[in-house]
Every structure is written in structure tokens, then in C-alpha cells.
From Swiss-Prot:
Taxonomy of the source species: Eukaryota, Viridiplantae, Streptophyta, Embryophyta, Tracheophyta
InterPro entries hit by this protein: F-box-like_dom_sf, F-box_AtFBL13-like, F-box_dom, FBD, FBL13/AtMIF1-like, LRR_dom_sf, LRR_FXL15/At3g58940/PEG3-like
Designated name of the protein: F-box/FBD/LRR-repeat protein At5g53840
SUPFAM superfamilies: F-box domain, RNI-like
FBD domain segment(s): 356-408
Every F-box domain range: 17-63
Keywords: Leucine-rich repeat, Repeat
Swiss-Prot/TrEMBL LRR repeat ranges: 103-123, 124-150, 151-171, 172-197, 199-224, 226-252, 273-299, 300-321, 322-347, 369-396, 398-423
Pfam families referenced in this protein's UniProt entry, alphabetically: F-box, FBD, LRR_At5g56370
Origin superkingdom: Eukaryota
Amino acid sequence: MVKTEICGKGSSQGSEEERLSQLPDHLICVILSHLSTKDAVRTSILSTRWRNLWQLVPVLDFDSRELRSFSEFVSFAGSFFYLHKDSYIQKLRVCIYDLAGNYYLTSWIDLVTRHRIQHIDISVFTCSGFGVIPLSLYTCDTLVHLKLSRVTMVNVEFVSLPCLKILDLDFVNFTNETTLDKIISCSPVLEELTIVKSSEDNVKIIQVRSQTLKRVEIHRRFDRHNGLVIDTPLLQFLSIKAHSIKSIEFINLGFTTKVDIDVNLLDPNDLSNRSMTRDFFTTISRVRSLVIRHGTIKDIFHYMELEPLQQFCYLSELSAVCSISNLEMLLNLLKSCPKLESLSLKLVDYEKNKKEEVMSSTVPPPCLVSSLKFVKLESQLLGCGTELKVARYFLENSTILEKLTLKIDYMYKDEANVNHIRQTLHAVPRCSSTCEVVIHSLLY
């Protein structure tokens, strides 16, 4: 939503207004559609040319905070729904900060679902409960993009969303597990799914089964009773952020899928959980592009203490967030990536009470000798020098490295410190004679 102010006209503002006024009505309506409805109405005072253009905008955007009282908000929004009761509405966005709005929300959604609505974005922020989505939304045959935040989706017998391509659920409460299953399975052209949720609902096992989904993001607080099933053969991108999850099952996950994993398994060393852990690592070992974080790296290390880690034979691109106390764990992972070509490594200090590890493996991982071409290091540390040690390790041990990039996010007092880092790295003996070293830093 864009905030705008109508000010007095100066000469430059007048000329800009004249240029805008020369545009055809449909282009002006496109511009107005990027404003809130309240701000779009305010443009009517610009000139007689603009007086009624806001009425042609097929986008309704309401926020109850923009009015002095909730009753004033209901009156303001209601007048627009009455104005559009017989016309096309392309997009509806409603943000409500009063639970009393649930009654009006139902009637508004019922109205727009009868008028070829394509985009719906509903958010209800109250401390006493969630707004309830009416039944009409579950059978809207023109809806393309649905975004819901802090609402309740009830159990329904019939769901039909034939045009829905993007589904974004942010802290949505489901009355039972079948509701989410029905919505996904009854959206035959669904391509993108995002679920952000706490563990406090009635969905214990999230099942994502779709023949059309290309992008899935699950960011959820799981507990020891929760699980996840992914069955999406056409998936191109998968992001899972979950803590203390009981089980994860992948079905038909293609090796071309880019996977972003931030998962803490309950206990990879638990015998009852080891089979699931093995299957989990076996599946992600087949992908070509992988993003992992500190917790997952630790799980991999603990798993490797019990049995050998599967080889990531297809992996060519790896991005990792790694604590400086777990650098040896990272090296052990790299030993299972024989064809890795690109490594992006972000150094953090999550475990401040633990000693920093030095990458001192006498035998470098095979990928450093045969395949690794690009290394990007990013540091948010306060000048402890770890990034220099890591950079030195890759420069001294990577046979065919083409480029090493060091990005430093912390503040340096002067250019001299950056020059010192640059000179230090350029003085490091390089195993690859063609390797280029690039340093990016922010000076304040």
C-alpha cells in the first residue's frame, strides 16, 4: 500500500499533473490501483479530469486503521461495495483490526466472489480471535491469488478453485486437517503455496500433494507430534523452516528442485527416528541446489557419527549458514559433495561460548581438487579474523578455483582496515593460478 499526500500545486507539480491527465483513463486507473482506496479518492480534488476516475478503479484496498473509528471504516468501505455491487472487481485487500468486522467481512467476500474477483488479500488482527472465512470463497471460480492472514478456515464439504495459482496462508487456523488437504487437492492449477504457522492448530500432519505445484514454502513451528509430507513431482523450489519436527516424508521430489532447508530433527541419533532421518538425507542428497543452515549442519554431523552420510552426487550449488564453532562439520559435509561447483558460505557466531574451529583438514574435500570454481564468503562477525582464515583455506586448497568473493557486513573505522584485508588475501599462495579475489565491504 502506498501513502500519498495531496499538496498545493507548484509549477513542476502542475506540469506533472498535466502529463498524467493526458493519459487514457485505463492507464490512470492502473496507477490509482497501486494506492489505497482512501488515497485514490483523494485524487478527485486534483481537477475535473480526475473527479470521477477513482470510481473506475477495479481494486478495493481498505485498512481499518486509516479511519478514526471502526464504525466510520465500515461506513466508508460499505459505500464502495455498494458502488461496485454490479461491476467488475479485480482485487480486494482488507485489513481489519476489530473482531466485529467478521460480520461485514462475510458480506463483502460474498459480494466480490460473484463479480469475477481474481485477487483476495484478507488480514484480521485482533487479540480475541480469528476472523472466519465464508463458504463462498471456497467455490470462487475466478480466483487466481488468495492471501489470508490470521483467519479461520472451516471444514467444508465441497471446494472448487479452478483458477487458483497462488495460495499464501499466514497464521491461518484450520478446524481440522482435511480442510487444508481439500483446498490444495481442489486447486487443479495451483503453482505456489506458502504456509506460515505456529504449531497451535488442528493440523498435525501437513500434506502437500499436487501435480502442478512449482514452489512450496513451509515455515512453521512444529512440535514432537507434527509431521510433513511433500508429494509434488513438478516442484522447482522448496523451502522448509521447521524446528523439532517429528517426521518429514518426500515423495516424487525431482533432482532439479532447489531446496532451502532449516530443519532441526527431534533426535537424529534416536534409533526410532533414524530411519526417517536416513530417508530425509537420502532425498535431499539428490538435488542440484541446496541451502542449509546451522541446525541442519549439526544434525548431519550427529548422523554421520552413527553411519556414513549419503553422497550428494548431483549437488553443484551449496549455500550454507555456518557457526564458526562448526567449521569442521562443514568440511565433513563438503567431503560428500564430489561435484560441487559453487559454495556460498555465511559465517555467524550462534554459539558464543564455544571455541572457534579452524579448518585444518590435512586432506581437502575432493570437490576442492576437482570441481569447486566459485566461493562466496559473507561475514557478520566483529572482526575476529575467522573470515580471513576460511578464505585462506579455500585459496590454498582449491585447485581450479576461479573466483573467491568476500563480503564483509560489519563496520570498519577506516579504509586502512579494508586495505589490510585485501593485501593479506592477495599475499596468500593460491593453489589455482587463475583465481580472482574480490572484496566487498561497507564503510561507515
